[in-house]
């Protein structure tokens, strides 16, 4: 029987990130946070389904294709909010990508990673 791991909740994520920031600052290190680069949810779904995986079952589990994007955006927004709340410098990577007219060329075929041009 496969072992199931408990996924961290958003509260867990915030707590862990805050703890890391405190530990770094306590050691005299100035942390810098960055927002997450955007993903292309449709490309990611296509990538997941490329080897015969059931698109219907994946969408049944997700609810809709864009849920992947929204979930990742929530984490990015949380990082930005915590940076503001803790006075931690923030690099707005997501915003830089979203401002790009050539955004599709910056995201790889898997929908998650950047192309060489994106890096």
Functional labels for PLM-detected ranges:
Residues 1-117:
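Alpha-helical cap/lid subdomain in secreted, periplasmic
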């Amino acid at each position: 029987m496969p072992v199931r791991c408990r996924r961290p909740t958003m509260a867990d994520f915030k707590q862990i990130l805050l703890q890391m920031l405190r530990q770094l600052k306590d050691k005299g290190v100035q942390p810098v946070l960055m927002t997450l680069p955007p993903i292309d949810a449709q490309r990611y779904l296509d990538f997941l389904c490329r080897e015969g995986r059931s698109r219907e079952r994946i969408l049944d589990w997700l609810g809709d294709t864009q849920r992947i994007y929204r979930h990742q955006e929530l984490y990015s927004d949380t990082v930005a909010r915590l940076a503001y709340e803790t006075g931690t410098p923030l690099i707005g990577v997501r915003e830089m990508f979203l401002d790009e007219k050539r955004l599709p060329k910056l995201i790889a075929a898997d929908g998650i990673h950047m192309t060489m041009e994106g890096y």
